[in-house]
């Protein structure tokens, strides 16, 4: 019976040795993969630190760009008053009349000032729009960094958990198909390239933002200088025109005074000539009466004697004198009429000069707003804004 029984042979000694050494191999694999997980955690943490710093830099750049965008917007708003003032000056000067409606230097500078302000507003608006677009790009880069950082934080959490698992951990168990390659898996190079791209993109957008902020400050400063230079040019032209108008007005007033004196003189002449002519009437009547009466002398007594010749000569002399006086009287009337016409033209010109002078003086009064009030307050706000920003930067440096 025993002979015929099936007896299971004992494993050879060599096979037993392989079974005995297998756990050692498993332990080595466990340690190797734990090391690999540790290295992977270090890699993730390195990128996390890099991305966190980049994210903080992006946040700071966004803050700075928002401040500079506000600066440009305030500078843009501050141009409303100069434009209103320049437009009001143009409207006032359009109130000039007749011969005073000339395209003088003041008119040219006021028109140029409006063009300069419009150009400044366009330049500042372009910078505001560029800042808005750049903020959108920075926000996109920030969101990508934040998403990448969030994923890496989650990946680190998972890998840290895996790293801390041991063969004695209660959470370990068999998993179905654990060696599968999950959908969407990437290579280490792709993983690194993705984060590097996010960082490089953020760095590029920050560089663009820094250049834009420099351009904003340069534009604000340059436009302020351009506006101030044009303001001075316009006001110089207006003051010069006011000076010229005052001189012209003084000349008109001097001519008016002389003309009025000449009119008074001619009117005195007219009165004197009229009186002189009147004074000739009775002597003429007398001489004519004598001549007429002597025509009634009878017969041979109607003699053309010396008295007759003397009376005839007297009548002729008086008549000639009256004609000369009447000629002078007419000349005096003509001179007075010419003076009155001249006086009318002078008064008309004075009215125009006074109107133009009044309008230009109103322009200068309106332009006082540019050196007091809202504009000054705006510049104070901009200075305060700059001071606050420098204070914030200093505080950040101290905290760092």
Curated annotation (Swiss-Prot):
Domain of life, source organism: Eukaryota
Tissue: Cilia and flagella.
InterPro entries: Tektin-like (IPR048256), Tektins (IPR000435)
Compartments in which it is found: Cytoplasm; Cytoplasm, Cytoskeleton
Principal subcellular localization: cytoplasm
Record Pfam families: Tektin
Coiled-coil segments: 35-81, 236-294, 310-353
GO annotation, cellular component aspect: cilium; cytoplasm; microtubule; microtubule cytoskeleton
Keyword Coiled coil (UniProt): yes
A biological process term (GO) from this entry: cilium assembly
Keywords from the named record: Coiled coil, Cytoplasm, Cytoskeleton, Microtubule
Subunit-structure text: May form a heterodimer with tektin a or exist as a homodimer.
Annotated function: Structural component of ciliary and flagellar microtubules.
Family designation: Belongs to the tektin family.
Protein name: Tektin-B1
Source organism (scientific name): Strongylocentrotus purpuratus
């Amino acid at each position: 019976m025993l002979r015929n029984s099936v007896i299971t042979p004992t494993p050879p000694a060599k096979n037993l040795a392989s079974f005995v050494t297998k756990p050692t191999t498993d332990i080595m694999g466990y340690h190797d993969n734990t090391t690999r997980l540790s290295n992977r955690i270090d890699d993730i943490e390195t990128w996390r630190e890099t991305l966190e710093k980049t994210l903080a830099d992006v946040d700071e750049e966004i803050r700075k760009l928002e401040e500079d965008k506000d600066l440009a917007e305030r500078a843009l708003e501050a141009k409303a008053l100069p434009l209103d003032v320049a437009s009001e000056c143009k409207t006032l000067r359009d109130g000039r009349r007749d011969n005073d409606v000339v395209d003088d230097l003041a008119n040219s500078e006021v028109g140029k000032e409006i063009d300069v302000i419009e150009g400044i507003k366009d330049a500042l608006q372009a910078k505001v729009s560029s800042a808005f677009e750049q903020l959108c790009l920075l926000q996109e880069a920030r969101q990508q960094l934040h998403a990448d950082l969030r994923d890496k934080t989650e990946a680190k959490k998972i890998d840290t958990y895996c790293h801390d698992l041991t063969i004695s951990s209660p959470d370990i168990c068999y998993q179905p198909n654990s060696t599968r390659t999950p959908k969407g898996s990437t290579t280490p190079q792709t993983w690194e390239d993705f984060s590097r791209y996010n960082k490089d993109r953020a760095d590029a957008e920050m560089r663009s933002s820094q250049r834009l902020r420099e351009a904003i400050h340069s534009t604000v400063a340059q436009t302020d200088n351009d506006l101030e230079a044009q303001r001075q040019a316009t006001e110089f032209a207006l003051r010069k025109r006011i000076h010229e108008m005052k001189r012209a007005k003084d000349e008109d007033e001097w001519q008016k005074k002389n003309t009025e004196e000449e009119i008074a003189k001619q009117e005195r002449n007219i009165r004197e000539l009229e009186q002189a002519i009147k004074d000739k009437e009775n002597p003429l009547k007398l001489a004519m009466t004598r001549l007429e009466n002597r025509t009634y002398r009878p017969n041979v007594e109607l003699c053309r004697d010396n008295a007759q010749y003397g009376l005839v000569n007297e009548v002729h002399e008086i008549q000639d004198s009256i004609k000369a006086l009447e000629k002078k009287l007419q000349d005096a009337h003509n001179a007075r009429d010419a003076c009155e016409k001249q006086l009318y033209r002078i008064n008309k010109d004075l009215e125009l000069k006074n109107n133009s002078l009044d309008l230009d003086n109103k322009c200068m009064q309106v332009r006082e707003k540019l050196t007091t009030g809202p504009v000054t307050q705006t510049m104070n706000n901009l200075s305060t804004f700059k001071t606050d920003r420098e204070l914030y930067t200093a505080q950040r440096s101290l905290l760092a």
